[in-house]
Amino acid sequence: MATGYSTGVSPFDLDENNHNDSIHHRHQNHHSQSHDSSGERDDTEIEDIIQKTSKLNINTSTSTKIKNFFFQSSNRHDSSNSPPLREVFIKTINPLILTAISSFVRLYRIDVANSVVWDEAHFGKFGSQYLKRQFYFDVHPPLGKLLIGLSGYLADYDGNFDFESSNVYPDNVNYVFMRIFNCFFGILVTPLAYKTAVILGYNQFTCWLIAFMVIFEQLSLTLSKFILLDSMLLFFTVLTMYCLVKVHTLAIARVGSNSKTPLTKLEIKWYILTGISIGCVCSVKWVGLFVTALVGFYTIVDLWIKFYQTFAIDKKSPKKMSVVNYLIHWVVRIFTLIIIPMTIYVATFKVHFMVLNHTGPDDGTLSTLLQGSLIGNDLQSGPRSVAFGSLVTIRSQGLSPNLIHSHPHNYPQGSQEQQVTTYGFKDDNNEFLFEFGVDAGLRNQHATLENENSTRNGGNDDDYYHVIIHDGDTVRINHKNTGSYLRANAVGAPITSSSYEVSCFGDVESNDWADEWVIEIQSQDQSPDPMFQDEDPSEIHSVSTSFRLKHKQLGCYLATTGKSYPAWGYQQGEVVCKYSVFSRDKNTWWNIEKHVNNKLPLPATEYVPPKPKFWKEFILLNYAMMASNNALIPDPDRFDKLSSEWWEWPILNTGLRMNSWGDADIKYFLLGNPLITWISTIALIVCPLYLLVVGIKYQRQWILLSATDTSNANPANSQSLSLLAARALLPLAGWVLHYVPFILMGRVKYLHHYVPALYFAIFVAGFIVDAILNLDFSYHNNKFQYIFKVVIYSTLYLVICISFWYFKDLSFGMEGSSVDYRHLRLLGSWMI
């Protein structure tokens, strides 16, 4: 085995000189033995043969021309010798034909279901929010939903349809245009798949096979007919793969030309396009991080090989790259593959915040300052200074910025006292009262509210206090609805056992030292209105003051963890009391949001809240998205007909009913094309075995495994390692990266999560078919091999089309009784 690396710039560009020389040496020995045994030919006889053959007029047969047209590798022909028509077909005509077929099967009957289908109820509603400019919260990044909003805008939709599941679209909602807009992304996947196969150097029959499998793959086909994110996600995933393959092949071409420049302008262009595509795919769904990981792993291997070439770790290998050129490779990749994608991702959130500038249904999940910046917000900031007796809601400033909440349900373990949680919706169980410390309680002094919100009865005027709360004051926090006090207990919290449990306990007459908290002011945000810029910094002010609550007995701080309670806690956020060394720990920071106190004067003019900081809101929103994603766990006590498990997807053990199943409904059943899915699954099993065989043959010096193009070598004993990496390893790694994470995830899973992985599986299938049909059958002549290949490819095209035609109604919509379609139920688990 060789130990050095060649000048190749892409992964797996190994220096195989020693290995290949060994093979050539064996071939030469065999040749010399044959030559010695055969004897010398007569010179005059040789001259006679040369003269005769020179007079021959050799014409290429029609079958040979057809063979070269279809089976010549798509990226290896010399345009000066190739027929111009072939160039036109590969670059223009073939992609147009495939795009036309893809358009027909995806647009056909796209309008037939005139009601809200499946997740159109979610994403159509989010598009409406953009048109109404009302803030909302969702677990996915904004780009895909912004595009849905754009489709509604272009369709003259006003955003006032509710998109309730199964509701019929009114006449003023041009749902057909919005579906076509979404379908456009699904259509473009086909020409991208074809062009990717062309760049990989496949012959035209293999390119068409891959394109046909993509066209008639019914998971993505069905999803592309509706207002969903899946087509956009798949398109940008495919585009990223296309750009990566382009970068790979350009790098190989540069090395083959012995260029001295570290990167050509064309390579830099495609690196930039790769970065743009990564930014877009991650801005549609976080599943885009999986194809980003594929690019990342490729880049790591690439840079490691260049490091080896630059610093010549193996002393036997010469230094093949300067340090400056190596650093240039780093700079280009950091800028194009990290900075550009991150800029696009952040920019989509910037647009998201700019468009959604009105209050909406999900304000309860937002920070107080972000709510205050929304037009029409319902913040009741009340008097500027908070006093004992004030009724308040208290919001966390941690990564899960919800309101502190309690309800009359107890912990099943620990103290078994009343639960304390954080809650993302505005509710009267979020309301608390600031009460004096225990010393005042022992003197029977209680701060109360003398208004409709008060829960106290009677009393003299002397019993009412409106003393302003200052930094360092001791307070008790009383839950308004249950009358119990917020406290910390010296037992482990239910989820985060390293911190103390927080509960509510007792009543207004209780005087327990465990109920006392100390106010520690951390910061005062300044209003842009000069009238509110001279407020006392030692006082607690609603909205603008950030403070911590330190438990007086235990010395720990009231905090959120970002974790959620299980079903007994209604999946609400965990609240704990923890020791915090750093005062800047935002999980221990709180602010007053709602403030009611009729004893105190209101400001002369309406309070203008401080402006929210974009980066803070960006981080908070992304963490909230992550927390909500993690909270989407299956309920073990509930049977979910729509969800499925990861092991069911490659074998199509289950499908998914996308809408109502009545006889009067147009019914859609989400299911992959069985033939295509099963072929791709078999290929996923065969591919590692094939690569293992290639590795064994290489190790035993039975084949050449060159880093360079071997198009002119005998395919029986030579292969291009770079092409092998691009054709087999990249798609196989893409499938693994898009599939294995769902095995590890605890969240609820659905069949459509397999769509990106299936795309990579199709390319693995194309590789295996191409590899098998290009084996060197030396005992047959070339004409037989050509006919054999044509028959096999034609058969594959035919059975793919027949399979699609047989199951077409699952994607085009089933009318009438579902009984009429029971013949499509090949497996008993398919609920057709």
From Swiss-Prot:
Read off the SMART domains from this record. MIR (SM00472)
Where in the numbering of this chain does the MIR domain appear?
383-437, 466-522, 537-595
Q: Which UniProt keywords apply?
A: Endoplasmic reticulum, Glycoprotein, Glycosyltransferase, Membrane, Repeat, Transferase, Transmembrane, Transmembrane helix
Pathway where this protein functions: Protein modification; protein glycosylation
Where is the protein found, in the record's own terms? Endoplasmic reticulum membrane
Transmembrane residue ranges: 135-155, 175-194, 206-227, 232-252, 266-286, 293-311, 327-347, 676-696, 723-743, 755-775, 787-807
Please classify the protein's predominant subcellular localization into one broad category.
endoplasmic reticulum
Biological processes per GO annotation? cellular response to neutral pH; cellular response to starvation; filamentous growth; filamentous growth of a population of unicellular organisms; filamentous growth of a population of unicellular organisms in response to neutral pH; filamentous growth of a population of unicellular organisms in response to starvation; protein O-linked mannosylation; single-species biofilm formation on inanimate substrate
Whether Repeat counts among this entry's keywords is yes
Glycosylation site positions: 20, 59, 357, 453
- Tell me which EC number(s) this protein carries: 2.4.1.109
Q: Tell whether RNA-binding is among the UniProt keywords.
A: no
Renumbered residue ranges of the record's region Disordered:
1-44
**Protein name per its UniProtKB record:** Dolichyl-phosphate-mannose--protein mannosyltransferase 6
Taxonomic source organism = Candida albicans (strain SC5314 / ATCC MYA-2876) (Yeast)
